């Protein structure tokens, strides 16, 4: 048996040689196959050498196999032969489509052929020091260079190779030619291969060629390195010198000196929005905190639910998105079967209703009268109304409006009754008539006996308060010669021992001592006025030290020159003429522009005037004892409307169109700037205690400012329908008033507390009516009696009125 086996193997070797020789002959004889350039001489020599080495290896293997086979038993050999016969029977193909000669020739050619890969030669050179240098082949950076995208030679796709088991080929190449199956070894050879594993054996078949898939030494070495977790690239040095990027030494100086961004320490607005959403959900009950949820669960567990079987069903809480349908309105008298006669339409109304379109009708039925309820027919519009209601319910959007159950009385502040706040003026007791023009201004002397009024007819009249009798009159303006001059302001000197009356007429200011007081008072007043002529400097007066906004100077040199410059004459003090002396005028002050407002200091030596058209000299401070006029402002701060002194501090309140500025005259600085928020202010007045201010505006508002609080108004009163002309405080009582062009005077109670924590209490008391509106002008000026709760008003109806309790 052993000899027979050896003879069989020898026959196989000779057959393999014959097949190789036949393939060479056929390749030379067949002109169809073009193999030029594919195999060169060197490759052939290498193939011959590989073939000879393969023969030597085969003979050596045969000798080894012979030695091993001698030790095998006869039964094992019979078993192997049986398997070989079985394999041969399985390898029969269905060759109905192919000729027997072709199949035999192809199988003979392919059997025994060993495919080997020709490795590219490695070119070695030397470095300058003589060491060998390996030059690796240059990688061609094309799409085929990526191993994962290598084009497959066998283009069968995902079709398994088992489909081609009964065919001589295993697939097709790119050109559509068959890829023939390589020669198979016998079952005995396969068994021997599994016992003695050849070099690079894997036990796998190549899908493209169908031959066994072996791995090279380099690949095997690479796999072993990966298993041992070693470096796969020899050019990489794992023990390179360490570069200590992050040292153990602490760095003192920062890597970056950039300032911290603001977002690092400012709360995030986005987080605040998210938190507010969560807070809102918690307040609405959509989110229950864990503690509360735990308490509710414990409460549910502890509660004993005893259900009343015979009770009404409990109402379940509706979902938050569930809105109940609105209820239908209750029926009215028109829908009654026996409505009153006034609800029954006439024939004309019925015809008009029938001619009106359905969508424009006020109601869908015509009221009718029936004797009894059983005679009422069916309602024809019931189906239509139900259908339209259904459309409204599911098409029209709805929203839930939470009604606030608030007592209306709780919204009204608790104010004392006006009866408890008496006395205050409630009626007109005296009317002072006699002027032929509008009475623009009035003033009452410190004694409270005499009332002075100035009118557009150019006259100033003095009235006795109690009797309403005119005791003095002086004509200061001749309307024929000076039709544009008007009397804008009349003010008594607060010093009752002098009896001086200041009258602003056009560009002039007249100081009058009317002969109504007696010799002592009249003489004291004239002496006070004449005493100032001893201080006359005849135009050589240097610039005064009173400069409230001295910081407005452009440079230090200009300030130094200003200290030595001669003062410009902003106003001139003149002795009266003979005619003026006959009118009891003691002195005349001539200004550059018309004087609109005049206000005295509490001591009676200074008074301030306002000339809105005079620019930086709009505000002038006049000193009676020295006949001196000063302009405290170097630059104008808008159009000045009014100016007044503080009741007891050296401060000046200047009112422009939009702002009220408070200046300290002793320190010559701006103390505060009030922002009333009105478009055009008209008048201001200061509380006798000096910590509150009221301002009136032409946009129908009265503004109360608390000087101890913010610069914005504490209260804004909107009771008037037209421009507010005047607002005044009472000097002794907690009262103030406001007068407007609508002809009304509003009386208010104003209590200012000593406690700084309490805000002033403002209570409206009375609305006085009596003045007539002429030429869109109503009440032009008001003033309080110095002692009593009496109010005096001047109107555009040529009258002045006294309002008493």
Curated annotation (Swiss-Prot):
Give the Basic and acidic residues compositional bias ranges. Answer: 8-22
Pfam families of this UniProt entry?
Answer: BOP1NT, WD40
Keyword terms of this UniProt record: Nucleus, Repeat, Ribosome biogenesis, rRNA processing, WD repeat
Instruction: Locate the region Disordered.
Output: 1-105
Q: What is its main location?
A: nucleus
An example of a Gene Ontology cellular component annotation for this protein is: nucleoplasm
The residue intervals holding the WD repeats read: 434-473, 482-522, 590-632, 635-673, 676-715, 719-758, 775-805
Q: Is Repeat a UniProt keyword of this protein?
A: yes
| InterPro entries reported for this sequence | BOP1/Erb1 (IPR028598), BOP1_N_dom (IPR012953), WD40/YVTN_repeat-like_dom_sf (IPR015943), WD40_repeat_CS (IPR019775), WD40_repeat_dom_sf (IPR036322), WD40_rpt (IPR001680)
Q: Name one GO biological process term.
A: maturation of LSU-rRNA from tricistronic rRNA transcript (SSU-rRNA, 5.8S rRNA, LSU-rRNA)
Gene3D superfamilies in the record: YVTN repeat-like/Quinoprotein amine dehydrogenase (2.130.10.10)
Compositional bias (Acidic residues): 23-75
One GO MF annotation is:
ribonucleoprotein complex binding
**Region feature (Required for interaction with YTM1):** 382-418
Q: Where in the cell is it found?
A: Nucleus, Nucleolus; Nucleus, Nucleoplasm
User: Its function?
Assistant: Component of the NOP7 complex, which is required for maturation of the 25S and 5.8S ribosomal RNAs and formation of the 60S ribosome.
What does the subunit comment say?
Answer: Component of the NOP7 complex, composed of ERB1, NOP7 and YTM1. The complex is held together by ERB1, which interacts with NOP7 via its N-terminal domain and with YTM1 via a high-affinity interaction between the seven-bladed beta-propeller domains of the 2 proteins. The NOP7 complex associates with the 66S pre-ribosome.
HAMAP family recorded: BOP1
Q: Which family does it belong to?
A: Belongs to the WD repeat BOP1/ERB1 family.
Q: What is this protein called?
A: Ribosome biogenesis protein ERB1
Organism (species): Candida glabrata (strain ATCC 2001 / BCRC 20586 / JCM 3761 / NBRC 0622 / NRRL Y-65 / CBS 138) (Yeast)
Protein's gene? ERB1
